[in-house]
Amino acid sequence: GAGTPGRKGVILSGFSGSTSIPPVHDNSDYKGYSSTIPIARFIDAILEPGKVINWNGKSVKLPPLKMCIFAGTNPFHRHQQINRIIEGWRKLETVIAIDNQWTSTCRFADIVLPATTQFERNDLDQYGNHSNRGIIAMKQVVPPQFEARNDFDIFRELCRRFNREEAFTEGLDEMGWLKRIWQEGVQQGKG
């Protein structure tokens, strides 16, 4: 899915400034709040905006969050304080879940966008660890079922609505990105 192969996809590139196209904002600290927060502390940002925490060797001021998009992840499954999640969830104005399973996150979301499974899209995956790593091509087996769309198309459409489609796609379609990431992997493997 979107963001899986490398760090460029962790945040929408059209908003994060991880491309050569100028971002909506410079991705530095915004109004004194940190531009990044540890995922395990996102509930703290919702419930205690402005709180300063120590993270990764530095002080981080948690930003106020009004909206969250969860793509292919289920915080209800991985977070240790479910009641605190529910409390924070109620404070958000909008929650969007993008997933191919009907998870707890989907059940609590305001909007659910159905994503394709690994059988319904072309993708790349990583295998191995440390000195024995590689990437493999995963070819689409069946067309997307019902209203499911692949992550790339979902995020491209979201970026289009914010006039950031070109920044997100960098002029490439889904297969163009897969080929580019594959070639980057081939070059790294030669290193």
Which residues are covered by each model-predicted region?
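Extended redox/cofactor-interaction regions of prokaryotic respiratory oxidoreductases
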Residues: 1-107, 117-124, 191
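Catalytic, metal-anchored helix/loop core of enzyme active sites in primary metabolism
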Residues: 110
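N-terminal leader/propeptide and maturation segments of large enzyme subunits in energy/redox metabolism
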Residues: 69, 141-191
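Short acidic (Asp/Glu) and glycine-rich catalytic loops that position anionic groups and cofactors
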Residues: 21-22, 64-65, 131-140
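Short beta-alpha connecting loops at secondary-structure transitions
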Residues: 119-123, 133-144
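Generic structural signal for well-ordered, non-membrane alpha-helical segments
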Residues: 61, 131, 135, 147-155
